[in-house]
Amino acid sequence: MSKASLKKTLAGMDADQLRHLVIEAYEARKETREYLEYWLEPDSKTLAEKFRKDIRAVFFTGKEKPKAKAHPRLSEANKLIRDFRAMCYDTEIVADMLIFLAETEADWLSYKYYRRSWYPSVMRYRQEAEKYVETAGLEALYSERLRHLEKNINILYRHI
């Protein structure tokens, strides 16, 4: 359904029908529930903490040990970042979350002895974070952290 047809359909509904639709969507989808809760009470820091835990869980067990048998599902981490960016409009917190993802993957790699094939992945996340930081004009806030991350990634690459 296109946006135009959605608008047309919603315009034809009365207040009770709209209320019912929103409640159904709230109950049906976790993402919708999170979005509506954030929309009603925007608290970027609490939202960021929740997503930090979820991203960390992609790479580590509950006891902060790297997941042993399976590789982390980067598609899951990417989805978390997409969902976070869709909800949070605070550029500083989004930049922090992008850097956190790269730091978490680098941290996971420091525990594991994987092939060099993981290096491009962690560098891609770092570069994406750096590009976002530059676009948002937050270099003064995050340039040192990005340099430190790149240094750590390069040290890991030499030891793999």
Task: Please state what every model-predicted region is.
Residues 1-40:
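Basic helix-extension-helix modules of the SAP/HeH family
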